[in-house]
Amino acid sequence: MSPDYLAVGHVTEDLWRDGRITPGGTAWFASLAARRMVDRVSVLTAAAPTYDAERHLPGIFVHRIESPTTTQFENIYTPGGRIQYTRPSPVRLEPRHLTDALRNARIMHLAPVCDEVSPDFVAEARPDVFIGVTPQGWLRRWDETGRVYAKPWDAAPQVLARADAAVISIDDVAGDWRLALTWAAQARLFVVTEGASGCTLFLAGKPYHIPAPSVSEVDPTGAGDIFAATLFIALQRGLHPLEACAFACCVASQSVTRASLDSLPTPEDLAQCSTIAKRWARVAGHPH
């Protein structure tokens, strides 16, 4: 049976200065969030045989391409900002890795973390598949030591021409709104998340700001992945983009009030945020 939601991207191992290794990656966190909203969730990824998919992705079908290693990330925080290192899996994910069932997913979320997802997925996707993209990993390159730097997103025109929705954080482009606006002009629907300030939706190039509820932040980890998964599902279900963005903003805001996997959406979050989003959309003049 085909999944309701398919995330395509490397799952990761995140290394910490105290020696801990924790699971990570947009495909990992977004799929766990999606599982709170839909029944059938799958992940297409590449990882070493030692990666414990049953433990890290319970209730999710994992189609794992064999890899000698699992992609690793290490973040080092300095007074001058964050320095990031990666040791990526050498396996690039291509459309040929899709099974017939995965090819027929209702939603395909392209979720690269280190330029490992081929942009050809958009060209080969069935026309009735909702394509959501979080291009963060297409914006990264690294040197021989693994230190991560920014790079141009050369495939942006190709990807955005087909994608039903794309989401970036303003931090992904180091605050460069000019670059974000360039991509927004090429997209059907483009969202820039702005942390506690909410997000800006570009619909056919026109901007709409959606505020986030005021909350007490405990842990922001994964909030962007939760936002993207929630948004893609809401849009695929037919919500007006403004209501869908308000819903996703609310769910992501609730997630930062809890730590680790406790940040995943609860039934109470989803019900409360659905009501809030409907009310906000009515006030904004876009009920559906």
Q: Where do the PLM segments sit?
A:
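Charged helix-capping and loop-helix junction motifs
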Residues: 23-26, 147-154, 180-184, 210-213
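Conserved phosphate-binding/catalytic region of the ribokinase-like
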Residues: 1, 180-288
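Conserved N-terminal subdomain of the carbohydrate kinase-like
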Residues: 2-7, 13-21, 36-132, 272-288
